[in-house]
């Protein structure tokens, strides 16, 4: 379940506007790179959940992942996550896990199948202070490159609302039909993206 051509950028590091508290993952700024992409760790879970909760609760009334589920995936498969940090603060992230069936199912919301070859993208979220800056597309582009560097991952899959399908189609995702997963009264479209046959996706994102 997710939110937002691009090339990897090295943007200037914007600062959080006055009145917006820093994420718990922030560290001393003078020792940190201005802009950094890296895989998340369980220590980033609280920061990720705060961003996700604000992004999704007001729109959908639910979160794709709750705090214990974020910790679960960042413990089992941190290599399937990617965070964008500005001066040590998490500002955007993607969390995924492996799946071993042709299509997503209800249990794929909470399971990581270590022998699977499909990366299930659970959530893409951007901090409210950094939206409308093109960060979602840049992060997704970097994430697909990162997945492409992992030989076991052959395909990416996600579920989203119909209105977001055109956004993901820009990244070579294609709709395969309605998703079997429902959340309350919400229904979703399932999208897949092959990581084979796309050489530009095989570059390492440096995560």
Swiss-Prot record:
The protein's annotated pathway: Aromatic compound metabolism; melatonin biosynthesis; melatonin from serotonin: step 1/2
Modified how: cAMP-dependent phosphorylation on both N-terminal Thr-31 and C-terminal Ser-205 regulates AANAT activity by promoting interaction with 14-3-3 proteins.
Signal peptide as annotated in the record: none
InterPro entries to which the protein is assigned, alphabetical: Acyl_CoA_acyltransferase, GNAT_dom, SNAT-like
A GO cellular-component term linked to this record: perinuclear region of cytoplasm
MF (Gene Ontology): 14-3-3 protein binding; aralkylamine N-acetyltransferase activity; arylamine N-acetyltransferase activity
A GO biological process held by the record: N-terminal protein amino acid acetylation
Assigned EC number: 2.3.1.87
Main location: cytoplasm
Annotated keywords: Acyltransferase, Biological rhythms, Cytoplasm, Melatonin biosynthesis, Phosphoprotein, Transferase
Site (Important for the catalytic mechanism): 120, 122
Location of this chain's protein in the cell: Cytoplasm
Modification type Phosphothreonine: residues: 31
Region (Disordered): 1-28
Binding site for acetyl-CoA: 124-126, 132-137, 168-170
PROSITE patterns the UniProt entry points to: GNAT
Tissue-specific expression: Highly expressed in pineal gland and at lower levels in the retina. Weak expression in several brain regions and in the pituitary gland.
Stated family: Belongs to the acetyltransferase family. AANAT subfamily.
Quaternary data: Monomer. Interacts with several 14-3-3 proteins, including YWHAB, YWHAE, YWHAG and YWHAZ, preferentially when phosphorylated at Thr-31. Phosphorylation on Ser-205 also allows binding to YWHAZ, but with lower affinity. The interaction with YWHAZ considerably increases affinity for arylalkylamines and acetyl-CoA and protects the enzyme from dephosphorylation and proteasomal degradation. It may also prevent thiol-dependent inactivation.
Function recorded in the entry: Controls the night/day rhythm of melatonin production in the pineal gland. Catalyzes the N-acetylation of serotonin into N-acetylserotonin, the penultimate step in the synthesis of melatonin.
Name of the featured protein: Serotonin N-acetyltransferase
Species this protein is from: Homo sapiens
Taxonomic classification: Eukaryota, Metazoa, Chordata, Craniata, Vertebrata
